[in-house]
């Protein structure tokens, strides 16, 4: 009996050690899997965002040099721009994956000139909350950003509209995050949401 008791005690200690080792090993594996999944999702979303940034800034720059857009600001005639943008938005919807792209033209004093998706709403002052437009006016250079606006948080590419160096206004390509959410679910079976700091 004196011999058996220490053996039983050692066996119990050994079993506890094995269980603890197994438990911590499983915990580490789970943590590693979670970390790897998290990193994969981060890289995936970042790549998706960069693709959208490229689309936004490239098209904003192209539209900023569009004849109809420039003429509409020079003549203060919104109908000219509406005509020019009609074919562009049609092409987006029919020939690209970016079905919900929106185009917004601003005046040089940072007021809404034409929202192609809502032409009846214009003239509102954007200077108090649209910091990207102010930056483009100051630098006369295009940029991309995620920013809050009247339509909520969206990804934007903003470019200056210039005529022989004179700043006439700016144009932005606006995209939602819908395609990223859809693609992440389809490709990774992951649910993605986009949040912003309340202060913004």
Range-by-range predicted roles:
Residues 143-148:
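PAS and PAS-like sensory modules
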Residues 6, 174, 193-195:
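Residues in well-ordered beta-strands of folded domains
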Residues 36-45, 52-142, 185, 196, ...:
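Extracytoplasmic/periplasmic sensory segments of membrane signal-transduction proteins
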Residues 1-32:
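Extreme N-terminal signal-anchor transmembrane helix of membrane signaling/transducer proteins, especially
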Residues 106, 149-150:
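Short, glycine-/polar-rich solvent-exposed loops and beta-turns at beta-strand/coil boundaries
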Residues 103, 158-159, 192:
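Generic short beta-strand
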Residues 152-186:
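Conserved beta-strands of PAS-like sensory domains
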């Amino acid at each position: 009996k004196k011999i058996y008791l220490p053996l039983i005690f050692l066996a119990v200690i050994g079993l506890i050690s094995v269980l603890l080792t197994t438990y911590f090993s499983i915990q580490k594996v789970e943590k590693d899997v979670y970390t790897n999944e998290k990193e994969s999702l981060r890289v995936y979303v970042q790549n998706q965002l960069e693709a959208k940034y490229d689309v936004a800034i490239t098209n904003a720059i192209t539209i900023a040099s569009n004849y109809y857009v420039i003429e509409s600001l020079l003549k203060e005639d919104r109908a000219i721009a509406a005509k020019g943008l009609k074919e562009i938005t049609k092409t987006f919807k029919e020939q690209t994956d970016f079905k919900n792209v929106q185009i917004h033209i601003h005046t040089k004093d940072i007021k809404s000139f034409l929202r192609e998706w809502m032409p009846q709403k214009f003239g509102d002052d954007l200077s108090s909350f649209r910091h990207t437009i102010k930056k483009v006016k100051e630098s006369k250079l295009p940029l991309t950003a995620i920013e809050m606006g009247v339509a909520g948080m969206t990804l934007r590419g903003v470019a200056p509209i210039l005529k022989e160096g004179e700043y006439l206004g700016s144009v932005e390509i606006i995209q939602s995050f819908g395609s990223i959410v859809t693609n992440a679910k389809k490709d990774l079976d992951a649910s993605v949401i986009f949040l912003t700091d309340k202060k913004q």
